[in-house]
């Protein structure tokens, strides 16, 4: 068994004492997506760190609806990702399946949407449980929206699904920030899975009939469509910026020429894709943009969940050079055959560590980047359990961590999680605050959505 640091009762006690006076400077809030609960939860970070508020919802200051209610009063939306604007005045929220009622839409392949929200109103308790913070909503340009990057003039939105199916996407949309218009769309080439793929032109040429694709994973006919999940921007030594996508359908990572995409060119992949252990989901660039970390979440072809993250070199990937995957690190489990289902990643600001949420094994890994690049089997330097309180129905359910973020000083990681319950169930999700120095959970916020996904940290408030 590898030697790693785990949270002990002693560490927990010390960590609670350590946060008696929170280290955060200025006001800070966590903005967490409620997912099946179509609201964004604003959590006062300092309040969450106060011991009396631990394992309660007391630090939640407001919950903002991501869509206007349906005419019959039913809440709508499916918030899975959230990214702030440069001035932190606006939050862009990805609704994976758009303005759906989660009690009615019970499949993949809903049309994605983007909610544009006023951050000040999101933090105002007077607007709790209203849509007052919602400024506008627009179509994301395809189905199963998930990844989001905010650029000066456009949003980049990746799509992992096709109409009413889990397979069949090769699209990343470019959405005008001011108008919501779709200004362009990246079209990714199909894969080569070893079985026949649809005769589908890339770029698309009309008229072409819709392709026949698998309805639901796992299915051995997956592998033709990349189905891009989260996306990230890397910096090449040539001075150019490259777009990376984790492709759940083809078990690999694409590298694309961002400048050409912004000029309206639809096909912009510049090199062969980089294979990873299995279908990726979360992907993030290092602070200097030279490395890309990506999770191996699950296979779409067979019943298999991954247990590694990959660290990819931007320059080697963009040039198609061998060894672009610099390191592959097992996380969440000591068993080489164990399935930890790593979900998302976040880098510390100094680029020395990577935080990984392991959904299946209910823990959070800390990966030492220097050790990983040296192929040290001890690169996973900490593994921190995340647990939940008993639910109102008397059942203690697993943590199922998903979203990750790190404070700008590198002191804390925040992680969202919780199982998917019936949409009518009381808010049951959890946000954990982890002290990265103590390697321990130091605060637990309960009652955060239903199956929460992405989250972000707002420090020092909007400009």
What residue ranges belong to the model's regions?
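Predominantly soluble domains enriched in secretory-pathway, periplasmic, or organellar proteins
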Residues: 21-463
């Amino acid at each position: 068994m590898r030697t790693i640091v785990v949270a002990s009762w002693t560490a927990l006690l010390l960590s609670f004492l350590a946060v008696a006076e929170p280290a955060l400077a200025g006001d800070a809030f966590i903005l967490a997506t409620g997912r099946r609960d179509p609201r964004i939860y604003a959590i006062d970070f300092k309040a969450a760190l106060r011991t009396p508020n631990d394992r309660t919802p007391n630090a939640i200051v407001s919950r903002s609806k991501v869509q206007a209610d349906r005419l019959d009063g039913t809440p709508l939306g499916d918030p899975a990702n959230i990214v702030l604007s440069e001035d932190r005045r606006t939050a862009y929220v990805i609704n994976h399946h758009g303005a759906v009622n989660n009690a009615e839409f019970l499949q993949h392949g809903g049309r994605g949407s983007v909610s544009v929200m006023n951050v000040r109103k999101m933090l105002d308790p007077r607007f709790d449980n209203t849509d007052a913070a919602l400024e506008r909503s627009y179509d994301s340009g395809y189905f199963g929206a998930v990844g989001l990057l905010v650029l000066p003039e456009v949003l980049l939105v990746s799509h992992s699904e096709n109409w009413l199916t889990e397979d069949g996407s090769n699209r990343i949309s470019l959405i005008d920030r001011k108008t919501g218009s779709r200004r362009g769309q990246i079209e990714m080439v199909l894969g080569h899975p070893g079985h026949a793929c649809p005769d589908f032109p890339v770029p698309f040429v009309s008229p072409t009939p819709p392709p026949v694709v698998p309805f639901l994973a796992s299915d051995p006919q997956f592998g033709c469509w990349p189905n891009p999940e989260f996306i990230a921007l890397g910096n090449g030594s040539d001075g150019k910026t490259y777009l990376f996508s984790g492709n759940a359908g083809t078990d690999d990572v694409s590298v694309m020429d961002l400048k050409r995409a912004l000029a309206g060119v639809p096909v912009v992949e510049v090199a062969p894709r980089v294979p990873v252990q299995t279908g990726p989901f979360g992907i993030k660039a290092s602070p200097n943009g030279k490395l890309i970390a990506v999770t191996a979440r699950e296979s779409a072809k067979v019943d298999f969940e991954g247990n590694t993250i990959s660290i990819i070199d931007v320059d080697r990937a963009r040039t198609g050079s061998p060894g672009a995957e610099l390191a592959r690190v097992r996380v969440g489990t000591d068993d080489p055959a164990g399935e930890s289902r790593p979900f998302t990643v976040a880098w510390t600001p100094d680029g020395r560590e990577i935080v990984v949420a392991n959904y299946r094994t209910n823990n959070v890994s800390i990966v030492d980047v220097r050790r990983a690049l040296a192929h040290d089997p001890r690169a996973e330097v900490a593994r921190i359990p995340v647990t939940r309180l008993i639910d109102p129905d008397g059942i203690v359910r697993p943590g199922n961590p998903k979203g990750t973020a790190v404070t700008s000083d590198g002191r804390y990681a925040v992680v969202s999680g919780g199982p998917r319950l019936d949409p009518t169930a009381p808010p049951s999700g959890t946000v954990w605050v982890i002290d990265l120095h103590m390697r321990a959970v130091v605060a637990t916020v309960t009652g955060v959505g239903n199956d929460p996904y992405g989250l972000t940290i707002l420090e020092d408030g909007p400009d």
